[in-house]
Amino acid sequence: MAMIRACLSGVLVLLSVTIAYAEGDPARGERSFSKCSACHIIDNPRTRMGPHLMGVVGRPAGSVADYNYSAAMKDTGAKGMVWTEDNLRAFLYSPKKLVPGTSMRFFGLWSEDEINDLIAYMKTVPAPQ
């Protein structure tokens, strides 16, 4: 009986670790953000080639006031799209597939883990005050 409890405890620990990493690792996501930082800032509400990404998770698409979005992104935001984790995941995988006509010059991230890590990192950054 003790052996069964020990085995079950081990399985539960492994499952909890797997579930935590399925949600992404913010530290790895911060490192992955270097691929985004040529165009985006995440620690300051300024724009570069792209809009800042402070508080992006939960923000309506195309809503950073001082950024000139493509017509496609403005349209997407006007239709009510919000940057949920699922929408971000789809956009990071293939921007032009989710928002045809977007001006984002990025072909997408290659790995589901990298996308999950990046989203986990972006969730840690609050919206500007």
What are these regions (language model features)?
Residues 1-11:
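Bacterial N-terminal signal peptides that target proteins for export
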Residues 82-129:
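C-terminal capping alpha-helices of c-type cytochrome domains
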Residues 40-46, 58-59, 93:
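Detector for the c-type heme attachment site
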Residues 16-33, 129:
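Electrostatic cytochrome c docking/interface patches
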Residues 65-82:
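Short Fe-S-cluster ligation motifs
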Residues 56, 60-63, 95-99:
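A short secondary-structure junction motif
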Residues 29, 33-42, 118:
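The canonical Cys-X-X-Cys-His
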Residues 26-34, 46-54:
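Sequence context surrounding c-type heme c attachment/ligation sites in exported
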